[in-house]
Amino acid sequence: MDNHNEVPMSMSAPWASAARVTCLSLDAKCHRPCPSSISASASASGCASDSAAIATTKLRHIAYTQRCSSRLTMLMTVLLLLLPLSFTPAHSCGPGRGLGRRRERNLYPLVLKQTIPNLSEYQSGASGPLEGEIKRDSPKFKDLVPNYNRDILFRDEEGTGADRLMTKRCKEKLNVLAYSVMNEWPGVRLLVTESWDEDHQHGQESLHYEGRAVTIATSDREPSRYGMLARLAVEAGFDWVSYVSRRHIYCSVKSDSSISSHVHGCFTPESTALLESGITKPLSEIAIGDRVLSMGSNGQPVYSEVILFMDRNLEQMQNFVELHTDGGAVLTVTPAHLISVWHPERQQLDYVFADRVEELNYVLVRDPQTGELRPQRVVRVGSVRSKGVVAPLTREGTIVVNSVAASCYAVIDSQSLAHWGLAPMRILAMLQSWMPAKDQLRSSQTEGVVSRAEQQNGIHWYANALYKVKDYVLPKSWRHD
């Protein structure tokens, strides 16, 4: 939609030719007599009636052209509104029989005593270190949430409801697992025999005391199902799963405080973007309606409108990944954010999570002399903790930040799927642009006008909704967990 504002770039660039371009051209031609020829004929005859006929013909031609334009606009509007209805997201990524088609890959059950990942439970690659026991009088007790999912059976031997208490992340993964269990074995429900423990019935170092672990089984107590139950727990997103015995499965998760960088993808507020006017602005000052430098689907630089902020919080402390290139560019971004990576050996452009970009990989960086995107080698990958997060969304779904081309999306390992998921917001922005009050909702250089970007604080409701449902419709291999 923004391709008519492309910045000049050599079409011979390999990443431009490697990018897929889908074009839809509509050619409407009106076969009408040329008014100029009619006018010349009328002038030659000198007939007044012919002049009147010529004027009438011109008016009819103008009216016809306006009707053609109006009908074409109406047709395009209908097509844009109906296009999302022709897709069914569950068909491409449903994890179970209840959503879309069946899994294309086979899931193998765990064997007795097997753990996934094959690490210590307390390593950062698993559930992470202990943070301390939570008691009823502890300040952190308010962070535990009860789980009243009707698809889950809680044994609750103590009769205090303690087995229903857990961290938010544990509750989220447990609900996903309960859904998978019902899909895998109709009529069977998930059974939780232990969650948060306040009676010290486990070892001294147990995540049960923090509400980060659950002991589970199936409602029919059929041991032959437990290997697959463990596998389903892995797919549900538990950070550490152990087929600990023939009677139950043990699962645990990272602490809620340690996974904040995984729930969204953002840049630092002081990172900059280039506006169409030629001005470079910090992302903290970018507003809805600004047109910033992005990368089109054909790999070329293009200016695209900011339609919303998926996250914006200038006070939140966050962990970031720093990517340094041999040309001096530095991109600071959250670990789950998608970055465009160029593979010269395959002549292919991919999107990779920021924390999976390695040294010697190539990223696309804007050349200040030509304005073109050129590959630069990553020479160092570091980490930093900084204050503030900003995540603008453009119509293109990409943005050039600190001269480095990046996606606007995160968490989901597919640029195209993430872009499709935000299609309703692009359509909504298009409809809002047709409203008379459009200018009141956009940024303005006039004093006293406060942009919507300055009013937003936190995750956008639609982005938050997508994050909550992703575990139900996407396999774990597609997610940044």
Curated annotation (Swiss-Prot):
SUPFAM superfamilies: Hedgehog/DD-peptidase (SSF55166), Hedgehog/intein (Hint) domain (SSF51294). Belongs to the hedgehog family. The lineage of its organism: Eukaryota, Metazoa, Ecdysozoa, Arthropoda, Hexapoda. GO terms for biological process: anatomical structure morphogenesis; cell fate specification; cell-cell signaling; intein-mediated protein splicing; protein autoprocessing; regulation of gene expression; segment polarity determination; self proteolysis. Transmembrane segments: none annotated. It comes from the Eukaryota. GO terms for cellular component: cytoplasm; extracellular space; nucleus; plasma membrane. The record marks 334 as: Involved in auto-cleavage. The record marks 311 as: Involved in cholesterol transfer. A lipid is attached at residue 93 (N-palmitoyl cysteine). The record marks 337 as: Essential for auto-cleavage. Ca(2+) 2 binds at residues 158, 194, 197, 199. This is Protein hedgehog.
